[in-house]
Design a protein with these regions (language model features):
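Conserved small/polar residues in nucleotide/adenosyl-binding loops
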Residues: 1-4
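Short, well-ordered loop/turn sites that connect or cap secondary structure elements
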Residues: 6-7, 56
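Primarily a LysM-type cell-wall glycan-binding module
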Residues: 10-39, 60
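Conserved residues at the C-terminal ends of beta-strands
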Residues: 15, 102, 181-183
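Boundary/entry segment of secreted carbohydrate-active catalytic domains
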Residues: 18-21, 60-88
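Chitinase-like catalytic core of GlcNAc-active glycosidases
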Residues: 68-82, 93, 107-232
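Long, low-complexity intrinsically disordered regions
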Residues: 83-86, 92, 96, 100-105
């Protein structure tokens, strides 16, 4: 590792192992998991070096538990593009509740703009992480479009077509929920945007899915800027 100066005031987490195990001939993650009655995922979380090196070495020491662990349940979401490096994604997945994959756009006639998401979905399930579909106003050229978003918000028939296609794809690919990420929404579309979210939520909830929506951070209702004004 390259030596890097730590910034003053940075907090460091120091965990002290309370239970260690030395790998013996024939051991696997599954057998060690059974021996200590802990999930394999916990072994990966306690030993990040195992995530990209799944083969155990005889004599290798692994951490079973740490001293004075403060455990509580939290929900963690991570975003990833389909072209993310596999080794980076694998290091993150053991710590994620949801993996939101960026992202589907839609055409003016309601067809979804496809992405290569299936490898990430399979990997998410491998680590018991729930994959979340993302819908945005990204067009065929890869840019966010306020005009494309407005077209959707103001056209109920288009909303129905887009949602029909989304639900069919979610069932097919194994998504558990939908994340809506619309940037550069114009102020004139603020009310219609909320109406779209209400309609989307009702369609999703009726079929057992959830809805997340991404909002720009606002410090006041009067905050100016195209990223903020339409977000209530």
């Amino acid at each position: 590792y390259k030596r890097q100066a730590l910034p003053s005031g940075q907090a460091l987490l120091i965990l002290i192992p309370s239970v260690l195990y030395t790998v013996r001939p024939g051991d696997t993650l599954s057998s060690i998991s059974s021996k200590f009655a802990i999930p394999q995922l916990t072994l990966l979380q306690n030993n990040p070096s195992l995530i990209n090196s799944p083969y155990l070495q005889v004599g290798q020491t692994i951490v079973i538990a740490f001293e004075e662990e403060k455990q509580r349940r939290i929900t963690v979401n991570g975003y990833a593009y389909p072209y993310i490096r596999e080794d980076i994604l694998r290091r993150a997945l053991p710590y994620l509740t949801y993996l939101t994959i960026f992202g589907y756009g839609f055409t003016p006639d309601g067809a979804l703009i496809p992405i290569n998401d299936e490898p990430l979905i399979r990997m998410a399930y491998e680590y018991r992480t729930a994959p979340v579909m993302l819908l945005s106003s990204v067009t065929e050229d890869g840019n966010f479009s306020g005009e494309r978003a407005s077209l959707l918000f103001q056209n109920q028939a288009l909303q129905e077509t887009v949602m029909d296609n989304i639900l069919a794809l979610m069932h097919k690919k194994g998504y558990v929920g939908l994340d809506v990420d619309f940037e550069y929404v114009e102020q004139k579309d603020a009310t219609a945007f909320l109406g779209f979210l209400e309609y989307t939520a009702s369609r999703l909830h009726a079929e057992g899915f959830f809805l997340h929506t991404d909002l720009a951070p606002k410090t006041s209702a009067a905050q100016a800027g195209l990223l903020y004004e339409a977000h209530n």
